[in-house]
């Protein structure tokens, strides 16, 4: 009798072990595929941010408009995110994520298409479309008592030039492609995280989330590396003779091969979509597999019938689902803790998004570093630190079994530390640029009070210069001049790089003693002290990003814990929608609009309209860029304090009682009942179906 009982137990244990193995393997396969999609998602995001400067210059648009283009990703996401979050959890989640990745890839390819339909990039008004004529002969020098119209085209030519002008409406294709990329990215986070939270073992979802976010940082590393590489390549590489291009990557008019970034990221997104189409809807064992035990076979048959009935009911009860959606939506909006947390994260994330969107422009204007160098430093150095912070944040929550209030305190602490390091940026600013007629007078002694009209000096008043031109030259006195003509230069040497100008009369008025009144093409570089400050900036950026990442996992965990278990997916989706709508869309726009106010020299295209900004007042730029971001962060900290106080009143007693009973609140917020009122064990109660 004992032997028969032992055989029966063994027979029952074997299918149980097989089920557990298949279940865990299914979840691990999903995690692997989701990791690939996270890499594709973050790669696309970094590619867009690192290409902002080049898109702005290539299409001759303002920072506020390029911020709007950047926000089109969030617009696309916003269009479908709530419905994907709610109804997507009832459908085949892996396949929906796969479709999203494919659409995201198509959007990336579409973003790059305008490059193939536009003419050659014209970095100067004097630069002809024929690349072979980009030589010093097209540079205007001081032509005393000669007519300026010699350099101007006829109205007919100007009209034709407007049709292919860089600042035309071709940027709309970039807008549409980025929006399509946002639509495709929508299912990845809410459906992926809810899938993990539903099927992971108790307490493991935070660890998995930390691992996912850490792996996702591979995308930014690749993105920054590609951004650095392609930023050094001229935009029309393969189409023009590069030896005739007289500007360098340090020039404010330089445009890199931004379109190659989007081709690479788009193709990678398409590839990442493939594994999801081969994954099951849930990590269950195949229904056709038979159980050894008769009782287990009966249970399995009942489960299959229940699943079939549920699928049938879902198809017939669309109206009921819509009603349930609005009831669920009302439930999360009447949750004061959830609403407060959404508001504070909106302020916090708006600061991050706005600052990161224009960080490359900030580095270029403040420290004189090209975007290619900023890309590689931010990618190679800071991103591994950021990934470590994400992983460590999830590990700390799991290791110390932080309750809801504990997670909120931990998140607030990381925000305080991040702000503390961010404020240090105010102490490592460089002096304002020295640009004659824009930031200082031509004698180099006094700052210019207004830059609405370029003030001329007696040293160039007879040169008949085009004041709208931007062809900067650096005098050997360390001052940048808007053009060789406005520097009073009479002659030049060299048809390619480097080009040197001589007999520059405006250098003489600065009191230069060596009587070598020459200038070379390009803006004057920053001094060594400013370069050292740039490396301090990178070091502080590492610490700032580490603490920002350390609290990243806690954001998701707080959302999961302060709403009902069945509303997790909707709460995550609505939170993401608000962040994207008011943070992702608006933050780049108002950051860009304020940055535009610090511009001191705008380009003018052939249509006579304003193009992109050529140079900024770096001091005003820093005040706007750092000040706005700091104010948003401080405001979020005030809400953090209020949130923690409210959480203590609501959760502290409950957490103490749970601790006394020897239990820990899991991500499903304790055990629940299924639709038929049968008891359904939590993640920790059934080790066979959770990993």
UniProtKB/Swiss-Prot annotation:
pH dependence: Optimum pH is 6.5 with prostaglandin E2 and L-thyroxine (T4) as substrates.
Recorded superkingdom: Eukaryota
Cellular localization per UniProt: Basolateral cell membrane; Basal cell membrane
Impact when changing residue 625 to F: Decreased estradiol-17beta-d-glucuronide uptake
Residues in the Cytoplasmic compartment per record: 1-28, 89-94, 198-216, 281-331, 398-401, 561-569, 648-691
Positions where Phosphoserine occurs in the chain: 293, 295, 672, 682
Pfam families xref list: Kazal_2 (PF07648), OATP (PF03137)
Chief location bin: membrane
Reactions this protein catalyses: taurocholate(out) = taurocholate(in); dehydroepiandrosterone 3-sulfate(out) = dehydroepiandrosterone 3-sulfate(in); estrone 3-sulfate(out) = estrone 3-sulfate(in); 3,3',5'-triiodo-L-thyronine(out) = 3,3',5'-triiodo-L-thyronine(in)
GO MF, any single term: sodium-independent organic anion transmembrane transporter activity
Any one of the GO BP annotations: sodium-independent organic anion transport
Spans within the Extracellular topological domain: 49-67, 120-168, 238-255, 354-373, 426-537, 596-629
Keyword entries, A-Z: Cell membrane, Disulfide bond, Glycoprotein, Ion transport, Lipid transport, Membrane, Phosphoprotein, Transmembrane, Transmembrane helix, Transport
Annotated consequence of substituting residue 367 to F: Decreased estradiol-17beta-d-glucuronide uptake
Tissues where this protein is expressed: Highly expressed in liver, at the basolateral membranes of centrilobular hepatocytes. Expressed in liver (at protein level). Expressed in fetal liver. Not detected in heart, brain, placenta, lung, skeletal muscle, kidney, pancreas, spleen, thymus, prostate, testis, ovary, small intestine, colon and leukocyte. In testis, primarily localized to the basal membrane of Sertoli cells and weakly expressed in Leydig cells and within the tubules.
Membrane topology label: Multi-pass membrane protein
GO cellular component labels: basal plasma membrane; basolateral plasma membrane; membrane; plasma membrane
The Kazal-like domain, residue ranges: 453-508
Glycosylation sites: 130, 134, 432, 503, 516, 617
Disulfide bonds: 459-489, 465-485, 474-506
Role according to the record: Mediates the Na(+)-independent uptake of organic anions. Shows broad substrate specificity, can transport both organic anions such as bile acid taurocholate (cholyltaurine) and conjugated steroids (dehydroepiandrosterone 3-sulfate, 17-beta-glucuronosyl estradiol, and estrone 3-sulfate), as well as eicosanoids (prostaglandin E2, thromboxane B2, leukotriene C4, and leukotriene E4), and thyroid hormones (T4/L-thyroxine, and T3/3,3',5'-triiodo-L-thyronine). Can take up bilirubin glucuronides from plasma into the liver, contributing to the detoxification-enhancing liver-blood shuttling loop.
Disease: Hyperbilirubinemia, Rotor type: An autosomal recessive form of primary conjugated hyperbilirubinemia. Affected individuals develop mild jaundice not associated with hemolysis shortly after birth or in childhood. They have delayed plasma clearance of the unconjugated anionic dye bromsulphthalein and prominent urinary excretion of coproporphyrin I. Hepatic pigmentation is normal.
Written domain comment of the UniProt record: A conserved histidine residue in the third TMD (His-115) may play an essential role in the pH sensitivity of SLCO1B1/OATP1B1-mediated substrate transport.
Protein family: Belongs to the organo anion transporter (TC 2.A.60) family.
Protein name (database record): Solute carrier organic anion transporter family member 1B1
Organism: Homo sapiens (Human)
